[in-house]
A protein has these predicted regions:
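Long, low-complexity, polar/charged, intrinsically disordered or flexibly structured peripheral segments
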Residues: 1, 5-29, 275-350
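Charged/polar, solvent-exposed surface patches and flexible loops
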Residues: 40, 79, 206, 210, ...
């Protein structure tokens, strides 16, 4: 089963072996992205859009309408969402226009205040509010580790993504590592995104995983007067355990997936369906929805994701070869995710 594939031809004639020859195997449009393709001496093969050359940016804009929203615009739009949720402006930051005409923001000081007396507007309810970035690219609306137009790192105190805001609220309200792990898991499991091109999806997943680690470090490591982390007596910094990081990678890989957002199937999969007739002749099956230009009814591979809140049905039985430990009853088609009437399992607590 393929996890994510390139879904772009940008890398077919751009990767060189140690002898200076082009490598095609593993970098073609339909090839799966594997660790050996992007690590070691190939670790700089996949780069954020801002670091790609201008021609590559233009080509991707023409081919797949790829555009990246400036971070200040992401912030302004996320602020509108929070203004509606909280019922007031400037909850996480205040937008400013600088003298040179550029835009930025000033983070609010102190702990985020939630509406009093409203059980549906608590900090825990905010953390588990479902959110999704469609055609997410590198996911700048979810996390903002760097400015999408300049490539400059953004410090945690100034980050503006939807998940960044959830993590800020968590860091302001929990005391113990156990509390942090529990609430961070909820935040990540309620944050979704999909993307067509595999390299963008890879960068988005990477950004979310680093975000998980960085907010833990920011919460549990003391800082000096300059804001630098102070190591312990053994010269170490506190980081999430290896198992916790692996768990986070699993949530992220389920919640950020590869999909054609118009057809709601795996990209190009309608073109790869074949049928065999009574005489053993194999022919390509035509997708009626593609022919008619319709959104529904595509025959491509359906995108299966997880509704992490679904409880195991009382009469559930595993299918042959199915591992109950993988909680397969949570797997659903993307279309049905936000139609779920499943009650929060943590409802009493949250």
């Amino acid at each position: 089963m393929v996890n994510i594939f390139w879904a772009t031809s940008d890398y077919e004639n751009s990767v060189l072996d140690e002898h200076g020859n082009f490598i095609e195997e593993g970098y073609r449009y339909d090839d799966e992205i594997k660790p050996e393709h992007i690590t070691g001496r190939f670790r700089r093969i996949v780069m954020p859009r801002v670091l790609k050359d201008k021609q590559a940016q233009l080509d991707r804009t023409k081919d797949k309408a790829e555009v990246f929203t400036p971070s200040w615009v992401c912030n302004a739009q996320n602020n509108l969402i929070d203004e509606n949720w909280f019922g007031r402006k400037d909850v996480f930051n205040r937008e400013v226009t600088n003298e040179d005409g550029t835009h930025s923001w000033i983070p609010t000081e102190g702990k985020i205040q939630f509406p009093e007396g409203n059980k549906q507007k608590t900090w825990k309810k905010y953390v588990v509010d479902n959110c999704m970035e469609i055609t997410c690219g590198e996911a700048p609306y979810l996390v903002s580790r760097y400015d999408t137009t300049t490539g400059q790192p953004i410090p945690i105190s100034h980050r503006i993504g939807i998940l960044d805001r959830k993590m800020r609220v968590i860091n302001e309200n929990v005391e113990t590592e156990k509390e942090w792990y529990d609430m961070a898991e909820k935040a990540f499991k309620h944050t979704y995104g999909y993307e067509w091109q595999g390299d963008n999806l890879l960068l988005a997943r990477e950004a979310l995983l680093y975000t998980y680690i960085e907010y833990f470090m920011d919460k549990f490591n003391p800082k000096d007067a300059d804001g630098n982390y102070i190591k312990d007596a053994d010269g170490n910094l506190r980081v999430p355990t290896r198992n916790k990081i692996i768990n986070a990678a699993r949530w992220i890989s389920w919640n950020l997936w590869q999909m054609d957002g118009i057809k709601m199937v795996v990209p190009d999969s309608c073109d790869k369906v074949y049928e065999t007739d009574l005489f053993g002749e194999t022919t390509k099956k035509q997708c009626p929805a593609c022919i008619k230009g319709e959104t529904n009814g595509h025959i491509g591979v359906k995108c299966i994701i997880r509704d992490w809140n679904l409880k195991k049905p009382k009469d559930w039985q595993p299918s042959p070869g199915e591992d109950p430990k993988s909680q397969p009853w949570q797997k659903i088609e993307f279309r049905s995710l936000f139609r779920s009437n499943q009650k929060e399992t943590e409802d009493d607590e949250i």
